[in-house]
Amino acid sequence: METSMETVIKKAEILIEALPYIQKLYGKTVVIKYGGNAMINEELKTSVMEDITLLKYIGMNPVVVHGGGPDINKALDKFNIKSRFINGLRLTDKATMDVAQMVLVGKTNKEIVSILNQMGGKAVGICGIDGNVIECEQYKTTIDGQETDLGYVGKITNINSKLIELLAKDEYIPVIAPIGIGKDGQSYNINADTVAGEIAAALKAEKLMLLTDVPGVKKNKDSDEIIPALTSAEALELINKKIIDGGMIPKVLGCIEALEKGVGRTHIIDGRIPHCLLLEIFTNKGIGTMIMKEKILYYEGEKL
């Protein structure tokens, strides 16, 4: 009986720990980039959707930007279309673009919307073509000293955030597929991390949350210990020291750019951990790496 009562008291303490964060974030926008293993594993998918629904119910304005690489790969295999990647970006010809748009907008987006709605949320699925939310141009990159394009891969030129704001500040949860629209009316596939960062900046979001398949930024290459909080300057120093490397570099640089454009805090968290969003947002220590312009506490009990 005593053990049972201790458990109940512990649960109450956890709820009280969340109180200052709920107070700080009430009415604020939180942009969540949903991707990685959390999109594949059904239990993780459920826990992320529960977290997002709860954020809305306690007064925050969650905005979801999703990837869909695994779904796209499955569809391309069905159509016998082979994928090629250059510098981590999918080389997207017309056939690949048609499949990517069909999958991201018609399948992945609607599945997320459906799950959120089943949990009591009011999710609305859109892509960047709707209301010209994501305006873009063809992305160019340099390969062997020569500028080249990657087909129908887009570079964002403007975010028209009014539609997202109208939905998020009302009772709805916007769920956004990373397809943009060019001046010529052509649709383009855009990296979901990039879309999430630009939307967070346009909305002046309090938080940008990137769900990944890694625990966060490690103290060094030989350590499993995660750095809970970094300033932008400290993160850049770790890149220069090659402690942050590989696929983590564009994620960290995207976080820093979002901070420069007005986002309050950015987070790189492990989407493989159940209820990762709640654990990162509402606990003093968090579970991943938070990147800020400066280390400013939300309240005195916060541990950075």
Swiss-Prot record:
Binding site for substrate: G68, G69, R90, N189
Domain of life: Bacteria
Coiled-coil blocks: none
Gene: argB
Function summary: Catalyzes the ATP-dependent phosphorylation of N-acetyl-L-glutamate.
HAMAP family the record matches: ArgB (MF_00082)
Full protein name: Acetylglutamate kinase
Keyword Transferase: yes
Compartmental location: Cytoplasm
Family from the record: Belongs to the acetylglutamate kinase family. ArgB subfamily.
